[in-house]
Amino acid sequence: DLLTMRNVLTFLLLLFSLLCNGQSPKLFTTDKELSSSLINQIYQDRNGFIWIATEDGLNRYDGAKFTIYKHEPNNEHSLAHNFVRTVFEDSKGHLLIGTYIGIQMYDPATDNFTPLAKLEDTGETLESNINSFIERKNGEIWVSGNVLCKLDIKDHLLTVRKVDIAVTSPGSLFEDKKQNVWMAKGEEGVYQLTPDNQLTLHLSKDNGYVKSICEDQRGNIYVGSIRKGLFIYDKERKTFVPIDLKEKGELPVCFLYSGIPNELYIGTDGKGVVIYNIRTHEISEYKFDNNYFDSGNSKIHSILKDNSGNLWLAVYQKGVILIPARTNSFKYIGHKSTDKNCIGSCCITSFCKDNNGTLWVGTDNDGIYALTEKLEPAKHFSHTTHPHSVPSTVIKLYEDSEHNMWIGSFINGMGKLNKQTGLCD
């Protein structure tokens, strides 16, 4: 059907976009793509869309462009609130949105959002700052916010009923392979709810602010603390014990990601991304090419490895870094690259490599760029008021047998370029 075909085309666009970028990291910012650099989560749905939840809108990337969703006061089908903390898709394909004031569901058929979820017993809207969703092994969807709730979805109507448990305002939720539900409770620690409903509090207030929980492929449970670093659950002693990160000390852990075999990716609050090797217990800093900011001092609030193996990092107050996994012969140069941004942001219209190995690049509305053999910036000739200035739009570049560089413009005819001055004869 039409929706299936659209999903296939979206996947192909996303795949082609990522393949063309080689291994060069790509930075998405508020300059052109994102609604906000205050990013809470990166999530991929079953159709391949990348969703970015921010403090000022919800962003969706289809492999070619971003679509931004925001609250529209006179549109009841719009996003209920611009502060979006989390996105989650259940096993039936329902895409749930957790906002500052409640829960909505996105309808891809209409590109709209449902009304906010209501309380089952009173019919009133659940007004809650939503933190997390999980789908339990028994099919129940649990939601954490000001209260802990179970969510029911029927005919695009969302209803919730409160879970009778002595935990108020739980943060991140996680269910392990043995059906224990773990609840991060910030300063208070982390709660464990067993399958027989026994509730246990782990980690005292002295162990910092617990924010993230995950489980590795071996069934080990980890929690991350903003002030006290990384902990692992000791199953025999039934308690969490700190992991010695040696020279890294007590990392301010914001986010834990265990989707990569034998490695735990740790997003920190001011120390970038750190990798903990589960087998060797060694720690290392994750490094990538980046000319825009010091990645070792960045705040990483979310990490995602997508279906193609590409790594996405939410860098708080900076944007989103995409690090492609695939290697190919193409190297990206342009304004979206974190490595080489030396040809502006306008469309490229022509190329010419001269006898000295210099690559000349003609653009639409930004003149001519010259790059060295190592693709480093050499010169930029833009249009000025000088009567012999290069044109702003260059359609064609050509070097003749005497090494003269000729320019074909859009509406200003043809000219011979002086490679030193940038003027045309």
Where are these regions (language model features)?
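Carboxylate-rich, polar loop motifs that coordinate divalent cations or form catalytic acidic clusters
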Residues: D1-D425
